[in-house]
Amino acid sequence: MTIALGKFTKEEKDLFDIMDDWLRRDRFVFVGWSGLLLFPCAYFALGGWFTGTTFVTSWYTHGLASSYLEGCNFLTAAVSTPANSLAHSLLLLWGPEAQGDFTRWCQLGGLWTFVALHGAFGLIGFMLRQFELARSVQLRPYNAIAFSAPIAVFVSVFLIYPLGQSGWFFAPSFGVAAIFRFILFFQGFHNWTLNPFHMMGVAGVLGAALLCAIHGATVENTLFEDGDGANTFRAFNPTQAEETYSMVTANRFWSQIFGVAFSNKRWLHFFMLFVPVTGLWMSALGVVGLALNLRAYDFVSQEIRAAEDPEFETFYTKNILLNEGIRAWMAAQDQPHENLIFPEEVLPRGNAL
């Protein structure tokens, strides 16, 4: 047997170890390596949006007022996209367009690219934060996987779609009314509601809402009597070892209602994860298709018959005519640089004009 005598000396920590110890320390607000991406990007994205909606006009890019300073409110203010003439420029503050002039940069729409890019990386940082924390406490990464769905939608709508078009101009501006207008644009120019990917997205989101309502109600209905409190919350013991509700009772109830029911909690909760996430992923794929100007369903036979027979009309042909009206009205409004002129008789009429 060999005995080694001497003093054990631990190697000094290098810079990575020191940073790792500090970043992943147990504190009230976890930072982590993901925080190096999340916190600066979220700060700049939110700060840029608040700055733009408060002070910055869209007169030079869209011919619109879009800030609180100009009289907008929370629903009508927005950080607007750059002009179409700027195409896909990153609009860096020090770039050839603004040349370091902050006022000019804001007027050209630089805040939009600033908010969009920092927002995208901020969302990715938040997903990585969920990965990092899950790994630290030895959880599976399904929270992060689920959060990839809204990230996919954001990236496809705000970045990939305008990249497939002529410029950032055709992306949504960051504002409530601006997003509504973008939805109308999507319908008029892409017939988005008849796109199968949009249909899958609607089924996913509304189906998830239905599943949440059913699940929450079923759990409340089958709670074990675990206390003498007057309501659910006072009777709840956060350290209880037993189940909170009866899966067996819930299974029997829904078996009688529908004839089928979830047999175990794992499959039930996976299904609640699968439905909305898949729906949002499909929506994102559909928007990528729109970036390439792929068309939705076309029922040409109905259009031809409606054109030939004044007595034949379907909800589809009526919607196609509505889309033509949207295009005729929005194209001249939204793209003044194209100098589009439509005869008065093809434009929509109404006292709102």
Curated annotation (Swiss-Prot):
Tell me which Pfam families the record gives.
Photo_RC
Q: Which reaction does it catalyse?
A: 2 a plastoquinone + 4 hnu + 2 H2O = 2 a plastoquinol + O2
Gene Ontology molecular functions: chlorophyll binding; electron transporter, transferring electrons within the cyclic electron transport pathway of photosynthesis activity; iron ion binding; oxygen evolving activity
Q: Which range is the signal sequence, renumbered to this chain? A: none
> Record's InterPro entries?
D1/D2, Photo_II_D1/D2_sf, Photo_RC_L/M, Photo_RC_L/M_CS, PSII_PsbD/D2
Instruction: Give the way it sits in the membrane.
Output: Multi-pass membrane protein
Protein's name according to its UniProt entry: Photosystem II D2 protein
Q: Which organism is it from?
A: Citrus sinensis (Sweet orange)
Q: What is the lineage of its organism?
A: Eukaryota, Viridiplantae, Streptophyta, Embryophyta, Tracheophyta
Q: Gene for this protein? A: psbD
